[in-house]
UniProtKB/Swiss-Prot annotation:
The gene is dtd. Keywords: Cytoplasm, Hydrolase, RNA-binding, tRNA-binding. PANTHER family: D-AMINOACYL-TRNA DEACYLASE 1, D-TYROSYL-TRNA TYR DEACYLASE. It is an enzyme of class 3 (hydrolase). Gene3D superfamilies: D-tyrosyl-tRNA(Tyr) deacylase. This is D-aminoacyl-tRNA deacylase. It comes from Burkholderia lata (strain ATCC 17760 / DSM 23089 / LMG 22485 / NCIMB 9086 / R18194 / 383). NCBIfam families: D-aminoacyl-tRNA deacylase.
Length: 152
């Protein structure tokens, strides 16, 4: 399972004229399930994402996780957006292959599982809409961007 996480000042996702998710300071995570991924892989990726220290402490060092973005216990937002293109195979030709991505039904199930697990462990979780054509807006903070990947 893959997540491309970006530290943001704010972010939102829209489907048509409707805002489906919006956060202030926190993490925007583009999330992708790959073929063969399991609930255990989703749990492992979520634990890594929630514990990843990408927010600055009082000394300016990236040392704080999204659960404590100010060093005083304030949790940042988590905006989860499904994006199967992260699994693209780009090794040959000029057209990406999406064979490595989980099939849509399994991708949707794993994304829903990931969102439910995140909501159980973090106070501020917003989402996009699986399979929809979404418009994602964000203000990067840094920019600070990391590719997180776990194998089943």
């Amino acid at each position: 399972m893959i997540a491309l996480i970006q530290r943001v000042k704010r972010a939102d996702v829209r489907v048509g004229d409707r805002t489906t998710g919006e956060i202030g300071a926190g993490l925007l995570a583009l999330v992708c399930a790959e073929r063969g991924d399991t609930d255990a892989a989703a749990d492992k990726l979520l634990a890594k994402m929630l514990g990843y220290r990408v927010f600055s402490d009082a000394a300016g060092k990236m040392n704080l996780p999204v659960s404590n973005i100010d060093g005083e216990g304030r949790a940042g937002g988590l905006l989860l957006v499904s994006q199967f293109t992260l699994a693209a195979d780009t090794n040959s030709g000029l057209r990406p292959s999406f064979t490595p991505a989980a099939p849509p039904d399994e991708g949707a199930r794993l994304f829903d599982y990931f969102v439910a697990a995140a909501r159980a462990r973090h106070p501020v979780v917003e989402t996009g809409e699986f399979g929809a054509d979404m418009q994602v807006s964000l203000v990067n903070d840094g920019p600070v961007t990391f590719w997180l990947q776990v194998r089943p």
